[in-house]
């Protein structure tokens, strides 16, 4: 059996009604040297059986014994992958026919490229951007570049991104062999941030392939403004901070966090941004309690994260000045973090 150029992985959890569209979009790619793998995270809605019935042997179905989360679930697929490039596509995203080919073209343009970001548009409004790579706030929080802007080609001339969204991305085998796979303790959210920053710290570049288009139902699996999402986003941004940021930035990060939380609290009170949407579903006091619980959970995970930071130190190929330069180029502003949905 010949080795494919690309292994495309769809991680599925209870994707009944939409995962088959995602898988079919990969099988219908113009780029044909591809194997498609679906990792099912112990779905309880029959979607794994739906995939089996719809695609048979055209798709390799890997069943996880339980819901492993994003990082561990994708790692299960990556460990069994045969391709020299790994493409990830969320089960609530659909790839345009040129998607994989454009990602591969960008990855193979330069041997230093370890990641490629796609242009991800909203599924329901296909001229509205979901992400063109990520922006980073100085306390570890991230947000999609261009999110909710009308797509007028404003990012098409950007050759690079800081790191890709795991909803639609390519990672080269050579980078993953160098730095390792996703951090499995995150479970949800921030996994792609940690891996992307670890790659950048190790000297790998990230290209943007604006013609690699995917259409995404934003946070369909857990809800765009759910308390579960808010918990993991806040918990895991702390872990990203301690795993990847320079010590000098960790020291000053509480000031940036205080500013962001103050603006988010104002957003919750005035109904603006994601905090306002969350506050409409629950109380401000509940959100404060959720944030405290997130910090407690992050504190419990810190020994593991700091141990991984120590083990990864020998692979760091850029210093604090270069990291700050990347942050300046791809910085998320506090007002945007607080007031944009």
Regions found by a protein language model. Give the residues of each.
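Conserved short acidic donor-positioning loop in nucleotide-sugar-dependent glycosyltransferases
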Residues: 14, 26, 41-46, 54, ...
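Active-site-adjacent helix/loop segment of glycosyltransferases
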Residues: 202, 206-307, 321-324, 329
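Conserved donor NDP-sugar-binding/catalytic core segment of glycosyltransferases
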Residues: 94-137, 141
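A short, conserved alpha-helix in the catalytic core of glycosyltransferases
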Residues: 162-213
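Short aromatic/hydrophobic "clamp" motif used to bind/position activated sugar donors
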Residues: 86
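A recurrent flexible, glycine/aromatic-enriched loop bordering the glycosyltransferase active site
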Residues: 128-129, 138-143, 149-174, 193-194, ...
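Glycine-rich, basic loop-to-helix element that forms the pyrophosphate-binding segment
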Residues: 64-81, 91, 102
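Short, acidic, metal-binding catalytic loop of nucleotide-sugar glycosyltransferases
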Residues: 24-33
